[in-house]
Amino acid sequence: MQPQLNRDSPVKFIKRLLVFSLICIILGVTTIFGFYFYVKSDLPDVATLRDVQLQTPMQVFSQDGKLIAQFGEKRRIPLKLEEMPKELIEAVIATEDSRYYEHYGFDPIGITRAAFAVLASGSASQGASTITQQLARNFFLSNEKKVMRKVKEIFIAIHIEQLLSKQEILELYLNKIYLGYRSYGVGAAAQAYFGKEVKDLTLGEIALIAGLPKAPSTMNPIYSVERATNRRNVVLQRMLDEKYITKAEYDAARAEPVLSKFHGAEIELNAPYVAEIARAWMVERYGEEAAYTSGMNVYTTVDSKLQRAANQAAINNLLAYDERHGYRGAEKELWQANQPAWSTTQLSEYLSNEPTYGDMFPAAVLSVEEKSAQVWVKSYGVQTIAWEDMNWARRFINDDRQGPLPKSANEFLAAGQQIWVRPRTQDGAITAWKLTQVPNANTAFVAMNPENGAVTALVGGFNFVHNKFNRATQSVRQVGSSIKPFIYSAALNKGLTLATLINDAPINQWDESQGTAWRPKNSPPTYTGPTRLRIGLAQSKNVMAVRVLREVGLDETREYLTRFGFKLDQLPRSETIALGAGSLTPVQMAQGFSVFANNGYFVEPFYISRVENPFGNIEFSAEPKVVCHRECSTELDEFAEQDAASPYAPKVISEQNAFLTREMLYSNIWGGGEWSSDTGWNGTGWRAQALKRRDIGGKTGTTNDSKDAWYNGYAPGIVGVAWVGFDDHSRNLGRTAPNRNIEDDVSGAESGGKTALPAWVEFMSLALQDVPVQQKAVPNNIVRVRIDRDTGLLTNKLDSSSMFEYFEAGTEPMEYVSEHVNESIYSTSSGEELF
């Protein structure tokens, strides 16, 4: 007899199953709510994502928008989603979160699929975190692998999905994600790995970047090409699987070679000393964290055209100085004659780690012939140096002595040596390589707009990487004869004129404080007797400057010089001030000469034009006091304080004084007289005549023993100052013997006109291209009268013994020339002749 089946069994089973399911659901919901309330107090406010400011580096630009530098630990180029290629977005979604548009921040299906994949393969081949979860982790959580961190991540992701749209989440994610080499976001990664903007990436490059979030340190194409290639191919396969690309596109992208190297920020203008000024200014104003992470764009006053001109002129001139003093030998010896030469692989690897200074490259000598040498140049491989590009290399003995001219390259080069070379270029293409060396001396160059004080170009030294000390702003050096225009301006203010005669004769004065005689001398030590003030400044007559100082008075002169921004403690309280014993920076000299260039106004140098935040809003805008070109309330009043609210710069010398001083500075370049009648003469700045412009002027400066060489001058809208010297103040610039192997060789003692002026001339030749000649108008209250060249007195003669001269009205001579020349020598108020 069969047992009776329990007809209620299926019903009971279903009931039990439902009860069990309900219990599981209740437990699940309870667990979820329990987890939620447990972590609720620790959950961040995701609403902050609406106003999130991604950590973005500070960028420094020229006034015309050329990138100079980027500062900040994290490289990031924030982009709008619409600025990103569609293929890039699809590649990331296909690889990181294929169900991105179907879930609400947390994807149970994705987790289940990943779990089965782990069980099947024994390894975590698929990620379980959605893009939103990754965003939550990147913004609010650490990377530690703990259950509670994962729980928080899920809840935060759900909150994010409620707050932001899918497009907004994607944009944040693609700008936030770390992709290796300090690059955060796809914009920075495209620049770092390929030197491109994201819109210019190929499909293969897009896939490579999209594959980086999984392991940015080990799968990037710089660290491992093989791993990066494999990961790229996985991304391409996922894009094909999701039907984002065709099979033909897939095959073409897989066939792309992986060609990647590190690209820093794409610097468009070499101005590192200016960049450092901007960086320090930003840190002082906003604090270090805000300066480096808030994405500020700093626009400096630098003009890219003028900065490039200054870079070229300053470095060319410094290397020309260095080369005429001789070759100091190779940087080091890599292998000796009895040793095997290095392989190309060794050379390439070694030289890749050696610094490059501007356009100066390290190289290894491979072989040497009588009139040529074969070298391996960093980044350029095998190159040849011709004889004409190295025959300058006579031996350096000391700063004053050089060896004989070389007759063969074997005299100074040998295989195995590491040397330095520079390219010769034509129309941007390299045509040859020239032997050079890292200079021992250094240089500075400053260009300033005299209308408002904007520093439009600045070179602080030979190379910022080589030495970060900024000689343009920090190096306080004796200025030599550069100080004389300011002393002569004081003399004009005292009542002297351009025609005043000062005795150009030796001085022999006992100095009780030193217990010895003081004998200032001209350089060269030649004397012309009674000489007009114009000639005295133009030819830089030392003894005349001392006598002019005596007439004005030492204390009065020092006080007068403070009008130009010089400090009293920078100006010695002795007559040596007339010879340039005062010490100033190149920027101070540019500021001082700006007063002459702008008709008498004192402008403050500044470097930062404006600061913009990442949204384009202006955080700071410079408001410099500018020169007044119309009727202003600004009056000259012995440098008295003027209205601080005025937009105009204070007037510190009269327009007439500035004009007459410019006349003397003009003569420093163009001289005077008539060469055809033997009355012609040159000033110490005669080399600037090469510019063929009559709207320029300046003054040389050479200190005792030629330790410092200066040229300070102006042109329309520009004041330029060039300095050359050694950082070691005890070392002088020396002298050179003639070298017929150097084009335009200059021999003899180094000086302002020989050592610094060529940099000024080259700069102005580039800066003034397409700038028409602009003569300043003669001011009111200036008269022009005919005088005798020798005496400075009035004359009726129309021959070469006469000339026209400018005077401030009321100071022109009233007396006509006589035969008694000595009677016209300027005398002091006490009636004593200035001898």
Q: Where would I find each of the regions flagged by the language model?
A:
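N-terminal type II signal-anchor transmembrane helix
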Residues: 1-61, 99, 118-119
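A penicillin-recognizing enzyme superfamily signal
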Residues: 300, 304-307, 311-313, 342-346, ...
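Conserved catalytic neighborhood of penicillin-recognizing serine enzymes
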Residues: 120-145, 199, 266-267, 451, ...
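Non-catalytic, structured segments within soluble enzyme domains
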Residues: 32, 123-379, 562-563, 567-568, ...
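Short, well-structured active-site flanking segments
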Residues: 101-111, 184-187, 246-250, 469, ...
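Mid-domain, small-residue-enriched loop/turn segments at the edges of structured enzyme/sensor domains
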Residues: 517-521, 553-591
